[in-house]
Amino acid sequence: MKLTRIQKEKWIPLFAAGLVVVLDQCAKLLVGAYVPTNTSGVRVLGDFVRIVHVYNVGAAFSIGHQLNQVLRTLVLGIVPLIIMFLIVFSYFRTDAFCPVQRWAVSGIIGGGIGNLIDRFLRPNGVLDFIDVKFFGIFGFERWPAFNIADAVIMTCGLLLIISFIKQEKEISSQPSCNETGGVFRT
């Protein structure tokens, strides 16, 4: 079966999503096996980057860690699972995404799946292992530990926002139908 151009534009980025899941889970397995829990970890770039082994039962920045287990499962497991389903559903239902947006959404899907695997299969929470010095910015001497899935979600989310803003500016700079007599002229 030969894929059409549109089908390729939808499916090829999803292989990247799968790659994100594999890299994230393999890195977590390695960290879990070789880095002791709750220590200063392994220095990678001096004191700037360290590989640590910590668990986060909350969301980003441990938000929601104080919730009881039932609420935590609902708010941090079931709700994100529903959101992930809606993202995947809209990914396949629309042809409105440009290629950059498809790649960005695919990265978000891959990162989301990586963290959901931890959320449901790791009783201690999501394994975070990248620890970066932040020089006191926003009051953080070190940025809260994160993982590959988190990094991909944030990077792709930012890329998606920038692409939507750029797309909106391009659309708003085109003359309206009233100015061109119902025909777009560029």
From Swiss-Prot:
Enzyme class name: hydrolase
The entry's keywords: Aspartyl protease, Cell inner membrane, Cell membrane, Hydrolase, Membrane, Protease, Transmembrane, Transmembrane helix
Chief place of localization: membrane
Protein source organism: Treponema pallidum (strain Nichols)
Active site: 128, 150
Keyword Membrane carried by entry: yes
Membrane topology note: Multi-pass membrane protein
Listed GO biological process terms: proteolysis
GO cellular component, one term: plasma membrane
Catalysed reactions, semicolon-separated: Release of signal peptides from bacterial membrane prolipoproteins. Hydrolyzes -Xaa-Yaa-Zaa-|-(S,diacylglyceryl)Cys-, in which Xaa is hydrophobic (preferably Leu), and Yaa (Ala or Ser) and Zaa (Gly or Ala) have small, neutral side chains
Record keyword Cell inner membrane present: yes
Official protein name in the record: Lipoprotein signal peptidase
